[in-house]
Amino acid sequence: MVMFSLIIVCASTLKNRVLFLGKKAASKYDAENCESLAQVNRAEVLRYSLVYASNGTGNRVDALFSSVKELETWKVELLMEIACICRKIASKTKIRDKEKTLMGSILILFTSINQRG
């Protein structure tokens, strides 16, 4: 129950940060930046960031990856920012073994934001 409460608190605390990072990342890419970023294999970047965030366990990550690999560049960057935030929270709260659960909760939040546009 305590872990569930911690995840809820973390997710709600991060909601504004996630939205802010999304706006910041979206405004960062102008037309010429997008041309150079198009050369980057965004799907691979996303996959590796998710594997890193899930502490090397790839099963759930691969399932998620297959459903979101067509994300726009700014959304990939946002997802990597979320992965880093989850890592920081997990290390500061001494719940490294629960990091996958935390990351999963944040990804659910991210998915709902992504579906809204």
Curated annotation (Swiss-Prot):
Domain of life according to the entry: Eukaryota
Miscellaneous comment in the UniProt entry for this protein: Almost completely overlaps YOR365C.
Protein name as catalogued: Putative uncharacterized protein YOR366W
Lineage: Eukaryota, Fungi, Dikarya, Ascomycota, Saccharomycotina
